[in-house]
Amino acid sequence: MRSTPLLLLSCLMLPLGQRSSDDPLQHLPSNIEVLTHFGERADISPDNQRVAFMAKSFGDAMVIDLKSRVIQCLTCNVPAAVFLRVMHLGTGDYILIGPDHFENTHTSRTRDNELWYLSKERGSKPIKLGQKMSEGAAISKKSLKIAFSQTAAQAPDLAPEASRLIVADLDLSGTPHLINKKTVYESKDRSCTLEAQDFYDDDRKMTFTCYEPEGRSSVMGIDLQTGEVTNFSKAPGTYNEVEGIFPDGLYTAVEADRQCEQLGGQRGSGNIDIWKLRLDGTGKDFTRLTHFNDYEGGKSSNPVISTDGRFMAFQSARTTDAAGVGYGILLYWFNR
């Protein structure tokens, strides 16, 4: 999820009757349960047995076993760890995202953001992949394929307002490193700032977000074989950030502000909840999944879907915080 200035996250509420003053965690439906009481940016293991997450922004990566509910710290052997994301590879190993050290929030999230490899073997330490990148990454569940975006902050060869999507393979035959890097799409200006999200259709296609001016965004997809790009959300003037994809590749989870049509409030990445979008290119099949934004200051974000489609992990968040900040991981059961 992209980091967005707090100005765009502020909530301009309509009269208080529009949103409840209660705590959304006290009104969870029967298919949602609290998994942890801290943490953010969850990622489900390929075998659906564990959920990795960040303890906090610029902090340690953790993993929780879904049966025992035992939490293990993955990076506590790294002094002053300042990672921002943890994601599973298909091998069960991990990709970490974040800076080498903390300078300040802006510089460390942008210029210094890079990819790391972490073995699943206990006691392993992160290994730099030598790749600066922007925001999050797409990680294949079926291969060692990775995709990420870059802006001029990480790639000085880009024009100041340009961004690009790069697909690469992770080579684990020796010291982990990226090979076969290929730019698959480029935006020339701020009308669309890119962020990779998920592979689907046997890694032949990929979803990504197009961040637009004035705090808006669109759900996009690219056919990696033909280069054809599709706007799946087709809702100009609104916020639609693509998140975890469903295993059938027909639907994706989306952070969206569509509920503001009924609830009021400033549109953008502050007033969001989780929606389900059919990737048929019409932008019409949107279903709301969570209702945290029905409550003053509440939102839910950063959803990921299990590979069997049975559940979703996401986080409880606050409208006034920066994007990605969370206060605990929850599970949403589609089918127990």
Per-segment meaning from a language model:
Residues R19-R336:
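Sequence signature of WD/YWTD-type beta-propeller architectures
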Residues L9-G17:
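Hydrophobic h-region of N-terminal signal peptides that target proteins for export
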Residues R2-L8:
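Sec-dependent signal peptide recognition
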